[in-house]
Amino acid sequence: WKKEAYYDLMNKLKVAPGQRISRMSNGQRSQVALGLILAQNPELLILDDFSLGLDPGYRRLFVDYLRDYARSENKTVFLTSHIIQDMERLIDDCIIMDYGSILIQQPIETLMKGLRKYTCTVPEGYQPQLPVTCYHPAVIRQTLETYSFLPPSDVEGLLKENQVPFTGLQHENVGLEDAFIGLTGKY
């Protein structure tokens, strides 16, 4: 038992030691429960949608606290979340799943440096047929959008090879949320 972890988090949340749980918001109650879990000093911490019900301020505070705790205490944290932007600041390794299948498993740094979003202009009504190395190609108002780990010159070559009538190919690195959408599809 490591009570300091609990009291440190409660202090950051400004929760008084004698404050009744019945008078706390749902977010504060969740944080108290998470503080109690941290106080147990587990080697492996499993959190499923840990930020559910937390307002943005509490969520950010807890993400920062959890990141610092895991690093300073050398703990392993396995977590899931539907708030993807929290994960980008928190994780070292990433697994993106879609309908029970693992699409990608790699260090977050590798994913963020490698995946790019590509856009270009195509004629009205054009429907792309691209190889699987270009994820979820879609056209919205004459803009073809796809994601790929390939470098820009290779994507340009694929577009030409597949006789895509395009102009103005552009690319940008993406954040984790865009990476998730790019790999799983928009909807």
Report each predicted region and the residues it spans:
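Solvent-exposed, flexible loop/coil residues
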Residues: S25, P56, M112-L115, D178-F180
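Conserved protein kinase catalytic domain
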Residues: M10, V63, M112, F180-I181
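Generic alpha-helical secondary structure signal
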Residues: E4-D8, R60, E109, L150-S153, ...
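C-terminal coupling/interaction segments
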Residues: T143, Y147-Y187
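ABC transporter nucleotide-binding domain
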Residues: L61-L150, Q170
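Short, surface-exposed beta-strand/loop "edge" segments at domain boundaries and coil↔beta transitions
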Residues: L45-F50, G125-P128, S153-E156
